[in-house]
């Protein structure tokens, strides 16, 4: 048990360079592809290695613009909300219209809302 604790302590104290060398050894000699998160956790602040491609996006309605009625109808259709709920969402802007959407879906929703006159943001 003490050996594992000492090993864990050594692993936690590795520098970024040492972690990269360890990753290379694991990949080349043992065929193990280390997870990016494990490398980053013990990397000690290498922010560039922590960059991940975002896969879930939120479509935020910032304002309804001039044609509020068209935006309310579109929000109703896009979200499946009732007319009153869709109106409340539009009136309460900025609010999310869709959360956790794929990039393509978020872009499509944004395009539709902007064509209806709304101001939209993707986060």
Swiss-Prot record:
SUPFAM superfamilies: ClpS-like, Ribosomal protein L7/12, oligomerisation (N-terminal) domain
Pfam families in the cross-refs: Ribosomal_L12, Ribosomal_L12_N
Keywords attached to this entry: Ribonucleoprotein, Ribosomal protein
Gene Ontology terms: cellular component: cytosolic large ribosomal subunit
Alphabetical list of InterPro entries matching this protein: Ribosomal_bL12 (IPR000206), Ribosomal_bL12_C (IPR013823), Ribosomal_bL12_C/ClpS-like (IPR014719), Ribosomal_bL12_oligo (IPR008932), Ribosomal_bL12_oligo_N_sf (IPR036235)
GO BP, sorted A to Z: translation
GO molecular function list: mRNA binding; structural constituent of ribosome
Record has Lipoprotein as a keyword: no
Entry similarity comment: Belongs to the bacterial ribosomal protein bL12 family.
General function of this protein: Forms part of the ribosomal stalk which helps the ribosome interact with GTP-bound translation factors. Is thus essential for accurate translation.
NCBIfam families: L12
Subunit comment: Homodimer. Part of the ribosomal stalk of the 50S ribosomal subunit. Forms a multimeric L10(L12)X complex, where L10 forms an elongated spine to which 2 to 4 L12 dimers bind in a sequential fashion. Binds GTP-bound translation factors.
Protein name per the record: Large ribosomal subunit protein bL12
UniProt source species: Cytophaga hutchinsonii (strain ATCC 33406 / DSM 1761 / CIP 103989 / NBRC 15051 / NCIMB 9469 / D465)
């Amino acid at each position: 048990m003490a050996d594992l604790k000492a090993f864990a302590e050594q692993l936690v104290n590795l520098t970024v360079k040492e972690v990269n060398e360890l990753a290379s050894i694991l990949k080349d000699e043992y065929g193990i592809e280390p997870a990016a998160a494990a490398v980053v956790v013990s990397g000690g602040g290498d922010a560039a290695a922590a960059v991940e491609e975002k896969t879930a996006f939120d479509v935020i309605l910032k304002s309804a613009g001039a044609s509020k009625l068209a935006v309310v109808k579109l929000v109703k259709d896009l979200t499946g909300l009732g007319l009153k709920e869709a109106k409340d969402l539009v009136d309460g802007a900025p609010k999310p219209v869709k959360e956790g959407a794929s990039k393509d879906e978020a872009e499509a929703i944004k395009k539709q809302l902007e064509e209806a006159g709304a101001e939209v943001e993707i986060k």
